[in-house]
Amino acid sequence: MKVHSLFLMAIFFYLAYTQLVKAQPRDDCQTRCGDVPIDYPFGISTGCYYPGDDSFNITCEEDKPNVLSNIEVLNFNHSGQLRGLIPRSTVCYDQQTNNDFESLWFRLDNLSFSPNNKFTLVGCNAWALLSTFGIQNYSTGCMSLCDTPPPPNSKCNGVGCCRTEVSIPLDSHRIETQPSRFENMTSVEHFNPCSYAFFVEDGMFNFSSLEDLKDLRNVTRFPVLLDWSIGNQTCEQVVGRNICGGNSTCFDSTRGKGYNCKCLQGFDGNPYLSDGCQDINECTTRIHNCSDTSTCENTLGSFHCQCPSGSDLNTTTMSCIDTPKEEPKYLGWTTVLLGTTIGFLIILLTISYIQQKMRHRKNTELRQQFFEQNGGGMLIQRLSGAGPSNVDVKIFTEEGMKEATDGYNESRILGQGGQGTVYKGILQDNSIVAIKKARLGDRSQVEQFINEVLVLSQINHRNVVKLLGCCLETEVPLLVYEFISSGTLFDHLHGSMFDSSLTWEHRLRIAIEVAGTLAYLHSYASIPIIHRDVKTANILLDENLTAKVADFGASRLIPMDQEQLTTMVQGTLGYLDPEYYNTGLLNEKSDVYSFGVVLMELLSGEKALCFERPQSSKHLVSYFVSAMKENRLHEIIDGQVMNEYNQREIQESARIAVECTRIMGEERPSMKEVAAELEALRVKTTKHQWSDQYPKEVEHLLGVQILSTQGDTSSIGYDSIQNVTRLDIETGR
């Protein structure tokens, strides 16, 4: 049993390691920096370059790619060479201090300088030292002597310029260049004020005595060749575990450690990607030797020359020669067999055509059945009977929805919940929408569903996700909404895809927008609507962090002559109104409770229900109310939002949240009152002070009773804020 466990563990680690070495870049990686293409194994961000080796990490600043901080990349190939620019090091003569010099060092990590580079010194009466640091330290250099300017067209042979070949050990992780000059430089300083030491690719620097000795023609960086490879092991050592992709092969690096990849003959591309090596079409690129009498046909990795019927290919000249003709045998049997085959094919094609027509008719009938079953006829009748109005419901087809979601591809899923699955859809006009595919529901509720579609399509509020239309030709109806790009409030507060950077101003504004939206739905919509599933996951944020209330799948319409409905309890734990949960009676105060939980989340940054918290504080409401009662609100408020200037606003918001989450619904304020109080929190301190002195005047101006806790009246001041708030709620947009 123990041996079996060890064997399984060994297989697990082997697979994990194989996955690591086979790692591939993300699909969204940046592929260019300025004019330089960036190909894997190099990359610009984490997950885009070969993992575990920062030598492949490219930093892109001002459209210039750099590797290892001070080496600018010009280009690189897949065979293990990188061409880059590195700065020179300089020493200048100064009469005060004799010398003013700088030395430069370069970090190499897993890169190494190619033997095709030369270490070069330009200057008179100077010498330069190259030092490497690693397991083996290495030093070399050269000296240049001259008291007068060298003659024009001089070579770099030790007079005004010297160069040397270097063989830098592979284990070197750092290289330093340092030029120096002799002490007495008065004889040369007028034509050679400074000396320069640098690496340069062989053939990329030609010494010009007068110009270079003066200022090196103002060149500050020189091209060099660097060698790179994958890891430290050979192809034999990593057989089956290298990162070479399909149609490629592994070869040992020429620098003595690691390996590189190359595409097989007949293929081209990036051999380090899983399918980077693609077939070369020799026929279209004219990389073939077929004669004019033969036809080139491309094959995978190669090609062949095809001769016309009646001729054969001469493999020496690759031309076509006539084939000796023979009289056909059994011509009668061939004719019979050919006729039988053709007849059989005609029968098969006819049967296939009939089956296709029957399948098309069946699908059409099924779509029509679903359309009627989902209330399509009722919807068309209601739309035609409504006459000219602001109802704008578009009925989409099943084919259009399938095409928009790429066949309901899992990669298009934006989210999943109790009400269904939401897909990202791209319509034929390239507009992006959110398509909600509901779960199978109660067929008896079709009329109510159609009513909700009609009512929701009339909601024209800037903080409600707009319903664009629906598709009724599927087994379950599809709803099409406008697409909101920046995720949900839950993602911003708790998710890993966003940094929690919402300021108090952002959070207060979001709370005001959501409260105003719910007040609009409760009080000013043509038919009052109770959302029934208010939570941070159903509040979307656009690119400006403007709140958009979404997911009305659980919503219910309240007839004008009723204040509440008896329904099957539905909602999300942590946000669910306890009174509604116990009685099944749904009214607008259920949304007030859920909004209070959302407000607590905005204030605390904590989840509504968290099993990682202690049992007594597992539910955010009890946790929050307890902190308020024990006067330790500061312990639960998110540290990113509270400061000395907004403590009063946060305390007032916390009080409103507690009022909204009272156990008895009748003790909770209405959303209209909540929206007014939250809007008032943005009033300046002077207005707050005025309202503290004249609370009756404030109450008269606001037109609503101010909420209070334990006799402490909250001032909301600002003589016109209620009118503004009411206008926002009533008009929507």
Swiss-Prot record:
<feature type="glycosylation site" description="N-linked (GlcNAc...) asparagine">
    <location>
        <position position="77"/>
    </location>
</feature>
<keyword id="KW-0325">Glycoprotein</keyword>
<dbReference type="InterPro" id="IPR000719">
    <property type="entry name" value="Prot_kinase_dom"/>
</dbReference>
<keyword id="KW-0245">EGF-like domain</keyword>
<feature type="glycosylation site" description="N-linked (GlcNAc...) asparagine">
    <location>
        <position position="57"/>
    </location>
</feature>
<dbReference type="GO" id="GO:0005509">
    <property type="term" value="F:calcium ion binding"/>
</dbReference>
<feature type="glycosylation site" description="N-linked (GlcNAc...) asparagine">
    <location>
        <position position="110"/>
    </location>
</feature>
<keyword id="KW-0597">Phosphoprotein</keyword>
<feature type="glycosylation site" description="N-linked (GlcNAc...) asparagine">
    <location>
        <position position="289"/>
    </location>
</feature>
<dbReference type="InterPro" id="IPR001881">
    <property type="entry name" value="EGF-like_Ca-bd_dom"/>
</dbReference>
<keyword id="KW-0472">Membrane</keyword>
<keyword id="KW-0808">Transferase</keyword>
<keyword id="KW-0812">Transmembrane</keyword>
<feature type="topological domain" description="Cytoplasmic">
    <location>
        <begin position="352"/>
        <end position="733"/>
    </location>
</feature>
<feature type="topological domain" description="Extracellular">
    <location>
        <begin position="24"/>
        <end position="330"/>
    </location>
</feature>
<dbReference type="Pfam" id="PF07714">
    <property type="entry name" value="PK_Tyr_Ser-Thr"/>
</dbReference>
<keyword id="KW-1015">Disulfide bond</keyword>
<keyword id="KW-0418">Kinase</keyword>
<feature type="transmembrane region" description="Helical">
    <location>
        <begin position="331"/>
        <end position="351"/>
    </location>
</feature>
<dbReference type="GO" id="GO:0007166">
    <property type="term" value="P:cell surface receptor signaling pathway"/>
</dbReference>
<dbReference type="InterPro" id="IPR045274">
    <property type="entry name" value="WAK-like"/>
</dbReference>
<dbReference type="GO" id="GO:0004674">
    <property type="term" value="F:protein serine/threonine kinase activity"/>
</dbReference>
<feature type="disulfide bond">
    <location>
        <begin position="235"/>
        <end position="250"/>
    </location>
</feature>
<feature type="glycosylation site" description="N-linked (GlcNAc...) asparagine">
    <location>
        <position position="206"/>
    </location>
</feature>
<dbReference type="GO" id="GO:0030247">
    <property type="term" value="F:polysaccharide binding"/>
</dbReference>
<dbReference type="GO" id="GO:0005524">
    <property type="term" value="F:ATP binding"/>
</dbReference>
<feature type="glycosylation site" description="N-linked (GlcNAc...) asparagine">
    <location>
        <position position="232"/>
    </location>
</feature>
<feature type="disulfide bond">
    <location>
        <begin position="283"/>
        <end position="296"/>
    </location>
</feature>
<feature type="glycosylation site" description="N-linked (GlcNAc...) asparagine">
    <location>
        <position position="247"/>
    </location>
</feature>
<dbReference type="InterPro" id="IPR025287">
    <property type="entry name" value="WAK_GUB"/>
</dbReference>
<feature type="domain" description="Protein kinase">
    <location>
        <begin position="408"/>
        <end position="691"/>
    </location>
</feature>
<feature type="modified residue" description="Phosphothreonine">
    <location>
        <position position="397"/>
    </location>
</feature>
<dbReference type="Pfam" id="PF13947">
    <property type="entry name" value="GUB_WAK_bind"/>
</dbReference>
<feature type="active site" description="Proton acceptor">
    <location>
        <position position="533"/>
    </location>
</feature>
<feature type="disulfide bond">
    <location>
        <begin position="244"/>
        <end position="261"/>
    </location>
</feature>
<feature type="modified residue" description="Phosphothreonine">
    <location>
        <position position="572"/>
    </location>
</feature>
<feature type="glycosylation site" description="N-linked (GlcNAc...) asparagine">
    <location>
        <position position="314"/>
    </location>
</feature>
<feature type="disulfide bond">
    <location>
        <begin position="263"/>
        <end position="277"/>
    </location>
</feature>
<keyword id="KW-0732">Signal</keyword>
<feature type="glycosylation site" description="N-linked (GlcNAc...) asparagine">
    <location>
        <position position="137"/>
    </location>
</feature>
<dbReference type="InterPro" id="IPR008271">
    <property type="entry name" value="Ser/Thr_kinase_AS"/>
</dbReference>
<dbReference type="InterPro" id="IPR011009">
    <property type="entry name" value="Kinase-like_dom_sf"/>
</dbReference>
